[in-house]
């Protein structure tokens, strides 16, 4: 599946995200944040055409934020609050976002690759043009989400909750969905392997005669 990729022009390298937020009079644009280690507090700001490389900003707050044309690479934003935020043309590569809150957010043209998003919460988010490749999303939450045009490959969804999220036309066949939480109406049109279909039937209380 093809999605729009981030369009980034970086002109400045900055060593503090918080200082940039504190002094911002308008959108934060064309910045590369590299090897930043700090706890950040941000609210209702927009980052455009920026790169975050090797940053460690755990237990931070980025509520109601806008991220457009952004790359996160080799970053750790675990236990950070990104709730009610907007992500458009964003890539997460080799990142750690364990226990991160993305509730009630919007994701358009977003790619997450080779990253750890265990225990992250995407519930009540609107998700489309979304690629997940080789990620660990075990014990994460996608409850009551709208998911459209989503491509998933070789990812781990052990005990992940998709309750009240329609999984129509989403292919999980080469991913691990052991113990996922779904309702009968959620799995209509979901694409799975033969073995996964048998496991899902057990979760849903369906007995198959052999």
Can you name each region flagged by the protein language model?
Residues 2-210:
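Tandem repeat scaffolds
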């Amino acid at each position: 599946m093809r999605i729009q990729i981030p369009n980034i022009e970086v002109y400045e390298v900055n060593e503090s995200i918080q200082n940039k937020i504190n002094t911002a009079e308008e959108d934060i644009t064309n910045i590369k944040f590299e090897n930043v280690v700090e706890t950040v507090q941000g609210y209702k700001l927009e980052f455009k055409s920026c790169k975050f490389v090797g940053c460690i900003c755990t237990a931070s707050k980025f509520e109601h934020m806008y991220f457009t044309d952004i790359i996160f690479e080799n970053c750790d934003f675990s236990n950070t609050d990104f709730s009610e935020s907007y992500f458009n043309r964003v890539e997460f590569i080799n990142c750690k976002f364990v226990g991160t809150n993305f509730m009630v957010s919007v994701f358009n043209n977003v790619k997450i690759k080779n990253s750890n998003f265990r225990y992250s919460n995407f519930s009540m988010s609107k998700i489309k043009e979304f690629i997940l490749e080789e990620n660990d999303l075990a014990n994460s939450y996608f409850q009551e989400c709208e998911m459209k045009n989503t491509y998933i490959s070789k990812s781990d969804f052990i005990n992940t909750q998709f309750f009240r999220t329609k999984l129509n036309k989403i292919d999980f066949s080469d991913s691990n969905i052991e113990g996922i939480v779904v309702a009968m109406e959620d799995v209509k049109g979901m694409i799975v392997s033969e073995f996964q279909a048998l496991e899902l039937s057990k979760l849903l209380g369906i007995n198959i005669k052999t």
